[in-house]
Amino acid sequence: MPKLEMMLLVLLILPLSSFSAAGEQVVQGDRRSDGLARYLQRGGRDVQECQVVTPGSKWGRCCLNRVCGPMCCPASHCYCIYHRGKGHGCSC
């Protein structure tokens, strides 16, 4: 089987969603494993300041901790925790 035909066959078998836009393979899992994946990837993220979304809210846009997903805690003494069934939250 020629190489071109083999490559086309492989592309038909593999789902396109298993690759990122950069061509890297991504791992998909259930909701419980997503937190672990974010935790393992957080080392490559640049640390920036969090911005509070709304006054009085304990959530800000996440820059400090990948475990919190798209959010983070606005105070430096707070940290992100995960409650089974409830999701991520801040503990201050």
From Swiss-Prot:
Record's function text: Alpha-conotoxins act on postsynaptic membranes, they bind to the nicotinic acetylcholine receptors (nAChR) and thus inhibit them. Through its two C-terminal domains, this homodimeric protein would bind to two nAChR allosteric sites, located outside the nAChR C-loop of the principal binding face and at the adjacent binding interface in a clockwise direction. This toxin specifically blocks mammalian neuronal nAChR of the alpha-7/CHRNA7, alpha-3-beta-2/CHRNA3-CHRNB2 and alpha-4-beta-2/CHRNA4-CHRNB2 subtypes.
Name of protein: Alpha-conotoxin-like Mi20.1
GO MF annotations in UniProt: acetylcholine receptor inhibitor activity; ion channel regulator activity; toxin activity
Comment, domains: The cysteine framework is XX (C-CC-C-CC-C-C-C-C). Displays a mini-granulin fold, a structure composed of two short, stacked beta-hairpins connected by two parallel disulfide bonds. This newly described fold is derived from the same cysteine connectivity as knottins (ICK fold). The name 'mini-granulin fold' comes from the structural homology with the N-terminal region of the human granulin.
Disulfide bond positions: C63-C72, C68-C80, C73-C90, C78-C92
Subcellular location(s) of the protein: Secreted
An example Gene Ontology CC term for this record: host cell postsynaptic membrane
Organism of derivation: Conus miles (Soldier cone)
PTM-bearing positions, type 4-hydroxyproline: P55
Sites bearing 4-carboxyglutamate, chain numbering: E49
Signal peptide range: 1-24
Tissue specificity annotation: Expressed by the venom duct.
